[in-house]
Amino acid sequence: MVCFAFIGFTANAQDATLDGYSAQSCPAQFHSLPLYPEAKLCQLFDDALPASLTYHATTDQQSTRDFYTSELGEADSIQELKGRIVLEYENANKIIVISKDGAGTQVDVLVKST
């Protein structure tokens, strides 16, 4: 069974802090997993494995899912849990959680091992 926590946040253009954390510039990739183009409000929670990063994409959930399918191929497992799309790759060692967030999506990238 896979357990993970969802970190919610809200922000606007004037306020780039997330519950006491400052948002970081978004990389193009995180542990070889791509981020949606023009990702915003990246928050790195841990870069050492197991690692996690959260960001905001200005697109809907389905477009974000289509991006990951195009970039990584069909996921080993696709689940919809409480309005979130959960994509698992490489025997659940790489997990992408796509949640509705205002006019866009929040994307949680979780990497257990590479």
Question: Where do the PLM segments sit?
Answer:
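An acidic-aromatic pocket/loop used at catalytic or ligand-binding sites
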Residues: 9-114
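Bacterial N-terminal signal peptides
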Residues: 1-8
